[in-house]
Amino acid sequence: IQFLEQQSMAKKYQLASHQQPQHISIPLQPVLFIAHLKRLFPVFNQGSISNHFPYYASTIWTDENEQQHQVMVFQYHYVNEVRVRDKNGNDVKVKEIHKDLWGVFIFDIAIQGLAVTTGNKTFDHSYRFPWHTSDIQTNQKLNIFGSDEMQTAKLLTLAFVLKLADFFEQRQGDLMFHPTRSTLCFLGPLHLFK
């Protein structure tokens, strides 16, 4: 049944399962390609044992300005190990916790150097400048960080902040625009393949 659901989804949204986006001029080995994408954003190290993409698919999306973007939708699976000390002081593995998040990479995006999260966290040095909007409700729901203070100030107009608030109205997760590459990554708990 799961296979049929995946096939139906692939046809409906023209998803190319386990395929790299077409914008990559020289296709990489899948392992190298995924490793490259995971290095671009500081959210793919959540597992102490494992961090991998068991499923991904590529397609093309058209935005509200009729511009087409290469897109890769993915499942991110990570595994954490819980360890405790026994009565003799030995480190003992108690259990493994498996978790899944789903996300999307969108390529050829004009915006760079911005990270927005619904979580109570910060990002690595790439997004080191916290930003607060003039809207108290948005500041309570979203944590915003930029890689360059001036660019962040220019980018976060009232209209853009309202778009972010609308985007996160029904979503939880992290939205990151890479500081130097024209790539966006969104990662959250909503299963995107259903």
How would you label these PLM feature ranges?
Residues L4-K194:
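Charged, low-complexity intrinsically disordered regions
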